[in-house]
From Swiss-Prot:
InterPro entries: CinA, CinA-like_C, CinA_C, Competence-induced_CinA, MoaB/Mog-like_dom_sf, MoaB/Mog_dom. The lineage of its organism: Bacteria, Thermotogati, Thermotogota, Thermotogae, Petrotogales. This is CinA-like protein. It comes from Petrotoga mobilis (strain DSM 10674 / SJ95). It holds the Pfam family CinA. It comes from the Bacteria. Belongs to the CinA family.
Amino acid sequence: MKSCIIATGNELTEGIILDKNSKYLAERLKSVGYDTLKITNVKDDLSLIKLSIEESLEMCDIIFLTGGLGPTQDDLTVQAVSESCNIDIVFNEELFEKIKKYYYNKTGKYLSILKKQSYVLKNAEILQNPVGSAPGQKVHFNGHTIYLLPGPYNEMKAIFDTHIYDELKSNMKNDHVEYSLYFYGLTEAELMQEVSVILKNFDYSTKIEEYIGPSLRIRMQKNDDFEPILEKILSQFSRYFIGFKSLEITLFDVLMKSSKTLSFAESCTGGMLSDTLVSIPGASNVFKGSLVTYSNESKVRLLDVKKETIEKFGAVSEETVKEMAYGLKKIMESDICVSVSGIAGPSLGSEQKPVGTVWYGFLINEDFFALKNVFTGDRDEIRKRATYFAFWNILDLVRKRYL
């Protein structure tokens, strides 16, 4: 089955926001066996939206449109589908009452502009929105199925997960299984040079996980033996292999498995380590906390770093991250304490310590060691690379010591 995705909105075509909707839909569709042929971002222009719909009808069995279901003048998706497919628009009284009730309960008032959301395609199946006012719609046209979903990511996702995913899954006879392998510190070209030979008889794709490395997705028949394939891949790339999930989730899993706790003392990363980790549900089982000690004064006051240490060696030094790690241990009492201090730039670098220099301190129980790396990129890129480098090394440490 072939699918197309059309995401509407000036905020997409002007680069104001990223198209998370299409990414999510494409991944979910692929997981149940749909082949997404085309993803289109189109501005809030009726003729352009109609053109995208008509092009998609030429090539796809199932079409998803996201955005353009709100109450304003530039919400044009229902009208575009109506005109492209010659489907009437009708007023839905029951839906109108639900929308009025939703807004009254939320704000204590009703706005007449909201009535527009009650005009739907004739004979459409209404897909109730569990987290917002704009419902989704499902219509059939000349052997095609068209879904209209709201633009806000949480609303689109809620409707898809609640009303659509299970139905799509049941409609597909899926005799395939997909494996995902994640790698750190490896280029896509290096991976592909070997994998293209190993996987020549299988369907596979690679993707760059930003600031980390490539991921490899392999699609096989359920009765194919995956183990020999995995062994061949790992015989070449075991030292780069993260696991079958993303780096941060794999780190969380191994901390859970080993029953170890983790804390951070962050300087140049500014809370990025903790922010990335706590995005995982259940992080409180392994993560005790983080201190963002960005200034030298905060390192001294909160982590008991000696003023003389910073004056003699600098804030970005092995000596400083060591004292940061031990100071963190006194406060958090975690099994693993990690400190980070670096120069994210764009200024303050020197010949001895260029922009991108980052020192790490790793304190596991009473064993300490330090690492230094020099990252490239702008300020934000350096901070992100520094974050994932820390995760990779913590993962490696926990595996070697506890698993």
